[in-house]
Amino acid sequence: ETHDREKDNLQVEAEVALICDFVYENEKVIDIIPRYFSAFNDFSIRIQDGNKLSTKKNWGPNTKGISQEIIEIDNFTQKGVLSRYHIASFIKRNGIVHDYGTTSAVKSYSYFFEQLKDWMIEKLNTQEDCGPLEELTQFLKVAAKDAKGILIAAGATAYADFGKKNFVQKGDEIFVYVYDAHSHSFDDIFND
């Protein structure tokens, strides 16, 4: 849903959704346990107005998407199931399908697995209100009482040529895939 905001430069952000349990101690996160993953579209607005990052992410209802297929994570390491998965995104415009993001191996992200977990734990417990970032400990105080875990969107792909030059328009169809590259080829996904 574009909410008639096409002029604000809307872009698909193909990501992996990690559905995680949090372990808390004294209102701090001491561990994150990724349990499941899925394809996720963190559909974002690209207005560069100096506001908080959250205003570019949370700009309207029905602007995020998660696949109905949720896959269990056996272990969140290089040896786990996620290492086999790639992420791809496409836009169908006027009947033609275009690559939107570059197809990437999930394990190729600069921060993933243990390094990502450690970074997230540190940021969740210490991030202060600074520039485009918001203080996160205020949310943890509520989450520690009311939430077992959280969905974390990780690893947006780089944009393919079409994605770099074209923002989402009303009527576009968006496709985001997280697929097992040991079982499917890029062509399988593109032609799905």
Model-derived features: where do they sit?
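Glycine-enriched loop-and-adjacent helix/strand subsegments that border the catalytic/binding cleft
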Residues: E1-A144, N166, D188-D192
